[in-house]
A protein has these predicted regions:
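NTP-binding/hydrolysis catalytic cores, primarily Walker-type P-loop NTPases
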Residues: 230-377
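Switch/coupling sub-region of P-loop NTPases
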Residues: 77-80, 96-209
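Hydrophobic positions on the alpha1 helix immediately C-terminal to the Walker A/P-loop
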Residues: 93
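Walker A (P-loop) phosphate-binding loop of P-loop NTPases
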Residues: 87
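Helical/strand "switch-coupling" subdomains that flank nucleotide/phosphate-binding cores, especially
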Residues: 209-237
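P-loop NTP-binding catalytic core
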Residues: 1-76
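The Walker A (P-loop) glycine that initiates the GxxxxGKT/S ATP-binding motif of P-loop NTPases
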Residues: 84
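Conserved lysine of the Walker
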Residues: 90
């Protein structure tokens, strides 16, 4: 019935079928291929923003400061590509980011299967939904899209050479993009895009272009959570891409959560800060580490409350907090308490960058504080 309604064939000669309805995506594999019977996958794509700030913060989908940082980057017109496996929630996340674009900024969505539904979610906004097909390719739609003069172009998924070129041409022409891609980690996004190309383009030139115009990569991971007793999704990586002053393509991991619960946080580079300033968005260079840092004594060192772990060595906090900072990371273990200051997020082995100058009473050594009491001053 799905095949008939779409005017397609589903038989031994055409054993694969992709179908869609208003809020469903369906994939069928004929029993000539799937030997235990027709294989069916149905995914719901409702016309609503399913992610809500309070809920995703409370359920450890994303850290509060990472959340606020990303929305600040959307405000500053950063190009963002979200990576992850099938079903990890990439599309829902770019819908959430798109919901925080400015109301007067025109959005055009380009999809081969409609699942963003932003035109229905925000009927009062100037949003145009375009769908590719056998007649209108990504390239054809993009040419028309450019003539519509959008501020934002949303490509639901980069999974072909044509889609890669659509992204590159969009960002190179000054438009802003939000898109998704299948990749194993955020830092692999540029190389994954290159691997989808069918032509022998110069790899260094291509990667430099992506690093120059795509500011951020975000990776979303999905897994069964013992804590929540259900399938759980979370933002596990945020990576900044940039090109150095001597024209080298580089990346910087701003946030990473490993499977064993370790988390690292780093501040954005001067390149991202400068780009945001050019867009009229002022962001403190210590926006991430400053708001997130907490110091808690490790279990495996002395009980005098003066020692804590920096990388793989022990750093002694001399003179009760007055001294010099060694670069490195501070490790916070689950439920540890120092001077009655607990691990407020109840996470295991949280790792934070330590190079944070002058934010606690003008001293260079961070002291135990409640994260909720830290401000931007």
């Amino acid at each position: 019935q799905c095949a008939n309604s779409m005017g397609k064939s589903f038989n031994m000669a055409n054993p694969f079928l992709d179908a869609e309805s208003a809020e469903l995506r369906m994939n069928f594999v004929h029993d000539s291929i799937a030997k235990n019977g027709i294989a069916v996958l149905i995914r719901k794509t409702p016309a609503k923003i399913r992610l809500q700030k309070d809920k995703i913060i409370a359920e450890d989908y994303i850290r509060l400061n990472i959340h606020d940082f990303l929305l600040k980057c959307v405000e500053g017109h950063c190009n963002i590509i979200v990576s992850g496996e099938t079903g990890s929630g990439k599309t829902e996340f770019i819908k959430y980011l798109a919901a925080h674009t400015k109301e007067n900024e025109k959005i055009i969505t380009i999809e081969d299967t409609l699942e963003l539904h932003l035109d229905k979610i925000f009927p009062h906004r100037d949003i145009v939904a375009m769908k590719t097909n056998n007649i209108a390719s990504y390239s054809d739609v993009l040419v028309t899209c450019m003539r519509q003069n959008p501020r934002w172009i949303l490509l639901s998924e980069v999974r072909s050479a044509e889609a890669v070129m659509a992204v590159r041409n969009s960002i190179s022409s000054g438009h802003n993009i939000l898109s998704t891609i299948h990749a194993d980690k955020a830092e692999s996004i540029p190389s994954r895009m290159y691997s989808l190309l069918e032509t022998n383009q110069d790899v260094e030139q291509f990667l430099t272009t992506i690093h120059r115009y795509v500011q951020l990569g975000v990776h979303i991971k999905g897994y069964y959570s013992q804590k929540y007793k259900r399938f759980h999704r979370e933002v596990s990586e945020v990576v900044e891409f940039y090109v150095t002053d001597d024209n080298k393509a580089e990346y910087k991991i701003l946030y990473k959560k490993t499977p064993d619960g370790h988390e690292t946080v780093a501040n954005p580079s001067k390149y991202l800060i400068g780009y945001l300033e050019s867009q009229g968005v002022i962001m403190p260079q210590d926006i991430l580490v400053k708001e997130e840092f907490r110091e808690v004594k490790s279990d495996n060192i002395s009980n005098d409350n003066n020692d804590f772990i920096v990388d793989n060595s022990t750093y002694r906090n001399m003179n009760n907090g007055v001294g010099t900072i060694n670069s490195g990371n501070v490790v916070q273990s689950n439920k540890q308490v120092l001077n009655n200051i607990p691990n407020y997020n109840n996470q295991s082995n949280i790792v934070y960058s330590q190079n944070i100058p002058n934010i606690y009473g003008g001293q260079n050594i961070p002291r135990p504080v409640n994260i909720n009491n830290i401000n931007n001053s």
